Regions:
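Active-site entrance/lid segments in N-terminal catalytic domains of soluble metabolic enzymes
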Residues: 1-163
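Conserved active-site-proximal phosphate/metal-binding subdomains
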Residues: 151-165, 171-311
Length: 311
């Protein structure tokens, strides 16, 4: 099995999650320079800002980087063309089927890596020509599915022949080693990078993550079919309470409209949407992204070596 770094040309078999309103060109470049595949998150951007972020990333790194496109975005068609025009080499996708773009991307030499939350979707996408698939468990922050990473990854590995990347609930070497044991060729991480020095989220957001305990995340929108994992705060608790009471979509929208931007840019930890995975309780300090990635890989490698010695 080829490791992800061999497929992507990176130092480590690690992808930085393309988090909307967070994964800027500068942040993606910092992650790429530190050994991961940095991703620009097109969610929260428009055509002009995406193009600007791609160009800024190019100016800051000579390492591989990519773009994450949420296919439900109203400008997804335009984004699909921009990555071709700007010479992006890797595209990850979520919230939809990338099928109509794949031939265009493949002709441009772009590696296409969808994010899936179920093995059946991975199996459906494989014949379309994808290069790999990210199997993301419900432990992750932001939009989530129902299956845990532990259950999802091996079933996706068994369902498809393309390389599988594990995501959701990965913040240290023990979890990285577990991902490889499940059959993954690499991992995608997001929450653990939110507390990097280079991450552009507000300091209040980082402080909230550092205070978090193991049970301090909650999933909003599960009843309405749009589940999102966030830190518990006034907004998320009230949202869940209203949702359980039968509030309609319009009533609930008043809690979430603009809430991610309030958290990321204004540091509003009361009514902002503090998207974070269940590993938030494992975060203890703000560090350079290079230190986080170096330790993640080295501790994972040592863990795998130790496990090998046990057998």
């Amino acid at each position: 099995m080829k490791l992800l770094n061999e497929i992507l040309g990176t130092k480590y078999p690690i992808i930085q999650g393309g988090m909307a309103n967070i994964a800027t060109g500068e942040f993606a470049a910092a992650c790429s320079n530190a050994g991961a595949l940095g991703l620009i998150g097109a969610g929260g951007m428009n055509v002009e800002t995406l193009r600007e972020n791609i160009r800024r990333c190019k100016a800051l790194t000579d390492k591989p980087f990519g773009v994450n496109i949420m296919l439900m975005h109203p400008q997804a068609d335009e984004f699909a063309k921009i990555v071709v025009e700007e010479g992006v080499k890797v595209v990850t996708t979520g919230a939809g089927n990338p099928g109509k773009y794949i031939s265009m991307w493949k002709e441009a030499g772009i590696k296409v890596i969808p994010v899936v939350a179920a093995a059946v979707l991975a199996k459906h996408l494989e014949p379309l020509g994808i290069d790999a698939v990210i199997a993301e468990g419900t432990e992750s922050g932001g939009h989530v599915g129902e299956m845990t990473t532990m259950a999802l990854v091996p079933q996706v590995v068994d369902a498809v022949d393309v390389p599988v990347i594990a995501a959701g609930g990965i913040a240290d070497g023990r979890q990285l080693a577990a991902a490889f044991a499940l059959g993954a060729c690499g991992v995608q991480v997001g929450t653990c990078l939110l507390v990097s020095e280079e991450c552009p989220v507000h300091e209040n957001y980082k402080a909230a993550l550092l205070r978090a305990k193991d049970s301090d995340t909650i999933v909003t929108g599960r009843i309405g079919g749009t589940p999102v994992r966030v830190l518990k705060n006034r907004m998320s608790r009230e949202y869940v309470r209203q949702e359980k009471a039968g509030a309609d979509k319009m009533e609930l929208e008043k809690y979430t409209l603009g809430s991610l931007r309030r958290a990321v840019f204004e540091g509003d930890t009361a009514t902002g949407s503090l998207m974070a995975g269940q590993v938030a309780g494992m975060l203890h300090e703000v560090r350079p992204v290079a230190d986080i990635l170096d330790e993640l890989w080295e501790s994972g490698r040592q863990r795998m070596k130790s496990l090998g010695e046990l057998c």
